[in-house]
């Protein structure tokens, strides 16, 4: 079995710090909880987050949320820009631009990776990275397919490949798997489908890597580390010092 290094971040808000000699490499994931712009999207039937919608989402409320978010990210940075920020529940590129380019976060030189997905509410995932710490090589979405329902739509998995300052390759996945809405048992197979899509992409990376690939998987999985999608499909096990390098 090919060996690889993999970190799985399973929480809705968490951060990890890696030491690279004198450099600090911080990885953060955050579910921004309905970070919508206040404008009507004519391509969607879901427009709750607009001034006339159910949530009465005005431009002033949008700016208030945006300001609270950037202040929190600044406080996490501690004067040293975060290396990678994984986000979910963002509506579009407009909201990431307003957060990272139209606030004091702009001086930290972040860039956002985002693709419009198929979620019925229009919420997506994004990867934000520091261009001073990482060079983007490529990015793409990993689609989650349901062989029993060709009309099935959900949020994509976002994948990005980076080079760090030492020209080492880093692979990053950001996930927001199908929710438990409708019942945990009734929806568990949907999260298994997401896990299968993720595992397939990881396996393909491992198969073509000459060296041990460095892989970060983060997101809101709507499951625990002990659920079937993580244990049975991903094959992940709880970490301890005796864990082998060829296990998740």
Task: Label every PLM stretch briefly.
Residues 1-22:
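Bacterial Sec-dependent N-terminal signal peptides
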Residues 17-103, 107, 113-123, 195-196:
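N-terminal, active-site-proximal structural segment of metallo-dependent hydrolase catalytic domains
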Residues 26-34, 54, 138-140, 169-179:
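Active-site-proximal beta-strand elements of phosphoester/diester hydrolases
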Residues 30, 88, 175, 219-220:
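Active-site flanking residues adjacent to catalytic metal/cofactor-binding acidic residues
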Residues 33, 91, 178, 221-224:
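Catalytic metal-binding/acid-base residues of hydrolase active sites
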Residues 43-46, 165-168, 172-190:
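Active-site His/acidic residue clusters
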Residues 90-169, 177:
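Structured beta-strand-rich core segments of catalytic domains in phosphoester-bond hydrolases
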Residues 192-248:
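Metal-dependent phosphoesterases centered on the DNase I-like endonuclease/exonuclease/phosphatase
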């Amino acid at each position: 079995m090919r060996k690889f290094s993999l970190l799985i971040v399973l929480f809705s808000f968490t951060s990890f710090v890696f030491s690279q000699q004198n450099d600090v490499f911080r990885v953060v994931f955050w579910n921004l909880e309905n970070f919508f712009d206040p404008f009507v999207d004519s391509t969607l039937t879901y427009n709750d987050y607009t001034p006339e919608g159910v949530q009465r989402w005005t431009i002033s409320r949008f700016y208030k949320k945006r300001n609270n978010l950037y202040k929190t990210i600044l406080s996490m940075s501690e004067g040293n820009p975060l290396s990678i920020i994984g986000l979910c529940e963002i509506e579009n590129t407009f909201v990431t631009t307003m957060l990272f380019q139209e606030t004091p976060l702009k001086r930290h030189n972040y860039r956002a990776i985002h693709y419009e997905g198929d979620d019925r509410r229009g919420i997506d995932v994004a990867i934000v990275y520091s261009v001073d710490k990482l060079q983007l090589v490529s990015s793409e979405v990993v689609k989650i397919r349901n062989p029993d329902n060709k009309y099935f739509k959900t949020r994509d998995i976002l994948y990005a490949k980076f080079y760090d300052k030492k020209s080492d390759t880093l692979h990053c996945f950001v996930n927001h798997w199908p929710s438990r809405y409708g019942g945990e048992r009734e929806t568990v197979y949907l999260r298994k489908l997401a896990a299968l899509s993720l595992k397939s992409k990881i396996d393909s990376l491992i198969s073509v890597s000459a060296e041990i690939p460095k892989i970060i998987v983060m997101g809101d999985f709507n499951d625990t580390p002990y659920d079937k999608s993580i244990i049975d499909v991903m094959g992940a096990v709880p970490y301890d010092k005796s864990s082998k390098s060829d296990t998740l």
